[in-house]
Regions:
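A Rossmann-like FAD-binding core segment of flavoenzymes
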Residues: 60, 66-93, 98-101, 164-251, ...
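Residue-level detector of alpha-helix initiation sites
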Residues: 11-12, 110-112, 151-153, 270
Length: 313
């Protein structure tokens, strides 16, 4: 089962790349483990022409478009990728076939590590949120909380940003110790600061009612934003020896090219802020760059064969 490109990850980045490569008449397979990051969300936003659709609808449409251009979508999980020492990669699936390919695009995304608080994970993607651009408009003018977590810079920025959508924002530093300057900036922004350890979210009748603190207080809130710790699913890339930057993430150029020839990456696996529409664009750009990489190989092979046939150039 030999391909021009195997795309690992069937989200917005991977499917966009698969479609573009199919349109380029490349033999492409998209391998999807079926565990999208945004699965808990009922709607997606900020994606032109798809605003308000469910994530499942977007993925179904993307798969249909990939297959419509001759691409394959394979359900499975990749356990490893190996370079065969020439210009080929071997992609091994759990309990499935081995795929041989000339190029690889990894679009496996990331996972959100949330604070360990009762009620928080169960409401993730509903009324516990992290991206104001994705969900802020839907909770506009509501009582909003911002919960301090391990991702300190992200959380402080998030608190100031969320204020654009509501005049009633409470920041719960929780384990974050604020400096005097940080307190001043948040207060000047019109954000109320409630100190004390957060113990749980008050969830009743399938709805968030508030944030409960260790001293027994419950602050009523209709939605809570939290800053997760973003952990990329980059094991396949690091296993291939792709260079990692000072920030701990795999390094790529503007097209998604890694330090390993023939290996590209796109979407949240190398870009934590990437939204759906950004990831889709990155997948498309990576596909074009990968096609040009294959084109260079095709031309070199054609010249070698031409000369071997005894034609004097």
């Amino acid at each position: 089962m030999e391909y021009d490109v195997v795309v690992v990850g069937g989200g917005a980045a991977g499917l966009s790349a698969g479609m573009m490569l199919g349109r380029s008449r490349r033999r492409v397979a998209v391998i999807d483990a079926g565990a999208p990051r945004n699965a808990p969300a009922t709607h997606l936003h900020g994606f032109l022409s798809r605003d308000g659709a469910s994530p499942a609808e977007l993925l179904a449409a993307g798969r249909a478009e990939v297959m419509g251009y001759g691409g394959e979508v394979i359900t499975g999980r990749v356990r490893g990728i190996e370079h065969d020492g020439e210009c080929r990669f071997v992609v091994r699936l759990d309990g499935g076939p081995e795929l041989t390919t000339r190029g690889v695009l990894v679009a496996t995304g990331l996972r959100d590590e949330l604070p360990d608080l009762p009620g928080l994970r169960a409401r993730w993607g509903n009324d516990v949120l992290h991206c104001p651009y994705c969900h802020g408009f839907e909770v506009r003018d509501a009582p909003i909380g911002v919960l301090g977590g391990d991702n300190r810079p992200f959380t402080l920025h998030q608190a100031a940003l969320v204020r654009q959508w509501s005049a009633d924002v409470v920041f719960f530093p929780n384990r974050i110790v604020l400096t005097d300057e940080e307190r001043e900036r948040l207060t000047a922004r019109g954000i109320r600061i409630v100190d004390g350890a957060v113990t749980r979210l008050d969830v009743r009748e399938d709805r968030l009612h508030g944030v409960e603190l260790a001293d027994g207080r419950t602050v009523p809130r209709a939605a809570v934003f939290v800053g997760p710790r973003f952990v990329p699913h980059d094991e396949l890339l690091t296993g291939l020896g792709c260079q990692v930057g000072e920030n701990g993430w795999v390094s790529t150029d503007a097209t998604g090219r890694t330090s390993v020839p023939g290996v590209w990456a796109a979407g949240n696996v190398v870009d934590s802020p990437a939204q759906l529409i950004t990831a889709a664009g990155a997948g498309s750009a990576a596909a074009v760059a990968l096609n040009h990489h294959l084109l260079a190989e095709d031309v070199e092979r054609a010249v070698t064969n031409y000369r071997a046939a005894g034609v004097v150039v």
